[in-house]
Design a protein with these regions (language model features):
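Non-catalytic cap/lid and distal C-terminal segments of serine-dependent acyl enzymes
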Residues: 21-285
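Bacterial Sec-dependent N-terminal signal peptides
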Residues: 1-24
């Protein structure tokens, strides 16, 4: 009897061990540390490669850059949207490398210098919440002179680039669009914080575009429910009027009344791929 019980427990342990060994790690990307001489610090770069990415073949890919791209931010769900949109039976957007830029200094990195910060409290925020700000020029230099060349030197890229930013990252995306539009081919801008600097970018948007835009680009501007933040909506709408008047820009303005500032980014990115790259016929699987 004892022998049978011992045999039973041995078999139970063996079967449990065999069952546990069947699992394999599930991974959708890699994280790298890139030292920035411009910023004087290390930055975490999260990278999701296309399914068929092969370092040995000749295929090259576009890159989708996600500004709030930490693993605890927007990297995972936006990488999922890109992978979904590039499935063979959907084929809405070309297979792409997704690059999420991680970090916890967004208020410094995504804002431009201002003479005073009185406007912060007028917007309902505390000045103490912005102990460091005004670093957008350095951050643009990091992206242009360090991150983009790094990706080009270490991964198979084809030069086509998309930028995604929401809220303060949306403000920064607008700044790049206006001041260095040649950096990206597609801009996906969501609920931008145009209030920064007493609406300086909004007031000078037309002047910047007229002076700096030298190529055709695609721009998507998505905003959530107007009643949640009337000022943000009105600022975005005013910016949309400037953008759509420029003949070099293929522009989409997307109002999403069912979304809030905290929920809008996922739906907006999905909509951006759908609206910037419309397709009506899909393969059946």
């Amino acid at each position: 009897m004892i022998g049978r019980m011992l045999l039973f427990f041995i078999l139970l342990i063996f079967n449990t061990a065999c069952f546990a060994q069947k699992g394999i790690p599930l991974s959708i990307g890699i994280s790298e540390i890139l030292h920035s001489k411009v910023l004087g610090e290390d930055r975490t770069i999260n990278i999701c490669l296309p399914d068929n990415y092969n370092p040995s073949d000749s295929v090259r890919y576009p890159i989708v850059y996600v500004l709030d791209g930490g693993v605890d931010e927007d990297f995972f769900h936006i990488a999922g949207i890109v992978r979904f949109s590039t499935q063979p039976w959907i084929d809405r957007f070309p297979q792409s490398i997704v690059v999420g830029i991680g970090g916890n200094t967004r208020r410094r990195d995504f804002t431009f210098p201002v003479e005073n910060t009185d406007f912060i409290e007028k917007e309902g925020f505390q000045k103490a919440n912005f102990p460091s700000y005004g670093g957008s020029e350095q951050y643009r230099a990091f992206i242009k002179n360090e991150l983009i060349p790094y990706m080009g030197n270490n991964y198979k890229t084809n030069g086509k680039q998309t930028l995604i930013g929401e809220s303060l990252a949306g403000l920064f995306s607008v700044e790049i669009l206006l001041k260095q539009p040649e950096l990206f081919d597609d801009y996906i801008i969501i609920s931008p914080s145009l209030w920064w600097g007493d609406e300086f970018l909004l007031e000078n948007a037309d002047k910047f575009l007229q002076r700096n835009l030298k190529k055709n680009i695609n721009v998507y501007l998505g905003v959530p429910n107007r009643e949640e933040d009337v000022k943000m909506y009105d600022e975005s709408k005013a910016l949309s009027e400037v953008i759509k008047s420029n003949k070099q820009i293929h522009f989409v303005f997307d109002y999403m009344p069912d979304e809030l500032h905290s929920t809008v980014i996922h739906q907006a990115v999905y909509n951006a791929f759908k609206k910037l790259y419309p397709k009506t016929v899909y393969s059946k699987q």
